[in-house]
Amino acid sequence: MESLLSQLSSMTVVVADTGDLEAIKKYHPRDATTNPSLILAAAQMPAYQSLIDQALTTSREMLGTSAAKADVVKEALDELCVVFGKEILKLIPGRVSTEVDARLSFDTDATIEKARKIIAKYNADGISNDRVLIKIASTWEGIKAAEVLEKENIHCNLTLLFNFYQAVACAEAGVTLISPFVGRILDWYKSATGRDSYPATEDPGVVSVTKIFNFFKSNGYKTEVMGASFRNIEEITELAGCDLLTISPKLLQQLNETHMDLPIKLNAQKPLVIEEKIHLDQTSFELMMAGDKMATEKLDDGISGFSKAIDKLENQLNERLELIEGEVALTH
């Protein structure tokens, strides 16, 4: 019998959720996703030190010798995310997701500006917009930024998505893809209820993605649904048939080593009709979010966590820049 991973790949686009190039080589996904935490983890591996140096050197050359170190580090942060993305694109046939600075999550204009800058860096290296997804947090401001960017042919992946109303707002904005989280929703419910576990069919994260998928397909939305943030392979198999699923190397390995029959659970051709289309303006969106304690808390936690990862990455880049430029100064 084929592995779960092989069977899943025949009904769902499998995406690698990692910045580790070796893991991507191993599992041959179509697409890959990164985020600040994953880039930070990869940047701390000795194997990728050369990519950090490349980002810093390119940024210094771009800004000139008179530029302040803080400005070089800021530029290098964008450069590093794109450098990793370009390396990943050498290994996959599809798209890479590169995230906008999470600290801009409540600033529409700054998010648009940053996204344009990121895509321009890819374009400068001959990479077309079709191979890049710009990841943006699913705040109202982020969704509005994505709406503008999509009209400029800059494709967006709306992340940190924890409830149905965030998904609806994204679909109405015409975004290319959403990443509804599964495991982080489960974490919240386990903590809130004191339950140790949920059967996969009752897992609140699985239930959330299933509802979003069926709503999109039954109402003709073109926005792709990519389940994300998994805690176990049971969550993944319960969403077999979803447009895409982005999966960590650890869980990809478990799927690859497990051999059992995998039935399709979500079917785009035969979606369950849940409810009619609804329209959300900013007021109704914010009311729906305010009424959902889990989504509000997890969105805030996610933005905070990614922002802290960016701060750490900037510190790492700053230390490395001082070391490199200190060594250069000593040789002159």
Curated annotation (Swiss-Prot):
Protein's job: Transaldolase is important for the balance of metabolites in the pentose-phosphate pathway.
Quaternary structure note: Homodimer.
Family: Belongs to the transaldolase family. Type 1 subfamily.
Coiled coil: none
Molecular function terms from GO: transaldolase activity
GO cellular component: cytoplasm
HAMAP family assigned to the protein according to its UniProt record, in alphabetical order: Transaldolase_1 (MF_00492)
Full protein name: Transaldolase
PROSITE patterns for the chain: TRANSALDOLASE_1, TRANSALDOLASE_2
